[in-house]
Amino acid sequence: MMHRPEGAPAWIEAGPKDATATLVFLHGIGGGKKGFQSSVDYFASLEYRALAWDMPGYGDSLALESLTFKNLAQSLEKMLDVAQVNKAVLVGHSMGGMVALQAWSQCPERIAGLVIAASSPAFGQQDGDFQQQFVAQRLAPLNAGKTMTQVADKLIPTMVAPNALPVGATLAQYPEGLALAHACMSAVPPATYRASLQALVKFEQRSALPTISVPTLCLAGEHDKTAPPEVLRRMAQKISGAEYECLAGLGHLMGFEKEAPFHEAVLKFVRRHF
């Protein structure tokens, strides 16, 4: 079921409201709630309550006047209020993992657990020149008049494991999961993509890691070049009691590449702790 309330982000959900755990899926910079529809359905079928949001500015959610991680976490808390979720297990992929860490800093009382997947506690380098170069490189196609579909054409093959796509694959040759990832990225409004990139390079929550006191899983993809396994492993070491798992044969788009191992890892974690 899709919800689009006034004053809060839109989300989809399924599953019983009295479930032993409520999972909230948070997508990345090129995603949307539709990318987690199968995850919502899967966990609801196992009697968990599951939600997936459209981050502000994405899909059915209105854009924020200023897209910052602080404001994104506030929007997430507002969605939890409207959805009547007291405590949630946040499952954040890529930029969504950063939103989850920011939410821990701002409203830890609303968080029962964390799954940080293919993400990082800070942008790669805090050097201003590096940030500007990163943003310029990512925005160059849009600045040259390319569409988000053309951005997806170029980016997605660089974010998956070797052999996940045939060399030079056309969209018609994409496996179903990666075709979904392509559709999600293609649908991101260019203005939102620009604003998200500017926020991304300013993200910094490394100091929050030792304060995390809820069950946490740091989930890596073996072939992820965007958030390499070593980044996730080191993050887990800085969180008391955190678990680390690396999904063999997968890249940055782990759940889109093969959803079964992603679901299995999250399910094992949830069953252990909730």
Which residue stretches match the model-derived regions?
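Flexible "cap/lid" loop of the alpha/beta hydrolase fold
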Residues: 105, 111-144
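Short beta-strand/loop motif that positions the catalytic acidic residue
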Residues: 212, 218-220
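Acidic catalytic loop of the alpha/beta-hydrolase fold
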Residues: 223-227
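Conserved alpha/beta-hydrolase catalytic His-Asp/Glu region
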Residues: 125-132, 145-210
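Conserved acidic catalytic loop of the alpha/beta-hydrolase fold
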Residues: 71-88
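Alpha/beta-hydrolase fold catalytic core
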Residues: 1-24, 45-48, 85-86, 157, ...
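Conserved HGGG/HGGXW glycine-rich cap/lid loop of the alpha/beta-hydrolase fold
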Residues: 12-62
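Catalytic active-site module of serine/aspartate enzymes centered on a nucleophile-bearing elbow/loop
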Residues: 242-274
